[in-house]
Amino acid sequence: MNILISNDHAGTELKKEIVEYIKAKGHSVKNYGDDSGESVDYPDFIHPLAKQVSENNEQTGIIICGSGNGVSMVANKYNGVRAAICWNKELASLSRQHNNANILSLPARFLSSEEAIEIVDVFLTTDFEGGRHEIR
């Protein structure tokens, strides 16, 4: 699986740990995010990722900022993008099962790296249930 990932300055360190985890699981990662940790304008880093997901509905993304809100709002402006802010494993599972989320939005200031990696793992391994959720 090829995972797209992006972040602002608040998510730089968490992103590095997530990228390391994803690669260790045998997936490839394309980084659209900030690597400097210097203050940046998050839309500049989220638009390219969201555009890619919008153009390829088989694509999966992870976006990270301090709260998860700003990056999610930018991503969800694109047709076909379903970005979900998740701060626990249950939300990650439901976002995939019931909402077919294709982008995981993480609040870096509210998660440990261990919690974030558990959420990423659930998001990447949970399938959409379809059925009654398909019509939404």
Where are these regions (language model features)?
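Glycine-rich phosphate/diphosphate-binding loop of Rossmann-like nucleotide-binding domains
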Residues: 4-24
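C-terminal binding/interaction regions
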Residues: 4-6, 10-11, 89-135
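Short amphipathic alpha-helical segments
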Residues: 16-19, 73-77, 97, 117
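A short beta-strand-loop structural module common to alpha/beta enzyme folds
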Residues: 28-39
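Structural motif
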Residues: 38-47
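Helix-adjacent hinge/juxtasegments
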Residues: 48-85
